[in-house]
Regions:
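Glycine-rich, basic loop-to-helix element that forms the pyrophosphate-binding segment
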Residues: 59, 77-85
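Acidic metal-phosphate-binding loop of nucleotide-sugar-dependent transferases
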Residues: 76, 101-103
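N-terminal glycine-rich phosphate-binding loop and ensuing alpha1 helix
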Residues: 2-50
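Conserved donor-nucleotide/metal-binding helix-loop-beta segment in metal-dependent transferases, i.e.
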Residues: 84, 89, 105-133
Length: 170
């Protein structure tokens, strides 16, 4: 089972444009996050999923420098962007992370993935985000590629398509 962390990133944030590449202690915030994700033992590959807007060319350049896979797709249909990123990177299990959380804990990532792999609950989704059980910024969502493909095929909600996982929780 290929476990791929898909990091959702874009430069056109409405509240703080460019925040994912803003420097924190002389390093881009996304660089700090990638370092922490790389410490997670359960993650086999990391891919940054960004938009096909030209403003996100900076993220593609950053991914190249960081030696991280990149997928570019629709700005608004983030669900489809995740699906294509998973397909192109051979993901069986997807760990969804957002690029504006540089303090993500690798042990929490490993814990969520290990629960998912146990399948003792018969679930295709494991999360500490719904209901929130950890502080904001430590959110980890883990789901099967099959669940992602079903959500992408079945939902027509623009909200679901923009926010990736709401379909899972209904």
């Amino acid at each position: 089972m290929n476990v791929v962390a898909v990091v959702q990133a874009r430069m056109a944030s409405t509240r703080l444009p460019g925040k994912v590449l803003l420097k924190v202690i002389d390093r881009p915030m996304l660089s700090i996050q990638l370092e922490r994700i790389r410490q997670a033992r359960q993650i086999e590959k990391i891919v940054i999923a960004t938009t096909d807007n030209s403003v996100d060319d900076q993220i593609e350049e950053f991914a190249y420098i960081e030696n991280v896979a990149i997928y570019r797709g629709s700005e608004n249909d983030v669900l489809h962007r995740f699906k294509r990123a998973a397909e192109q990177n051979g993901a069986d299990i997807i760990v969804r992370l957002t690029a504006d959380c540089p303090l993500i804990d690798p042990e929490i990532i490993d814990y969520i993935v290990s629960i998912f792999k146990q399948k003792s609950y018969g679930c295709n989704v494991v999360s500490n985000a719904v209901p929130r059980s950890y502080p904001a910024g430590l959110d980890v969502e883990c789901f099967s590629r099959q669940a992602l493909e079903i959500a992408c095929a079945e939902t027509t909600s623009l909200y679901d398509r923009e926010h990736v996982t709401p379909y899972f929780y209904r």
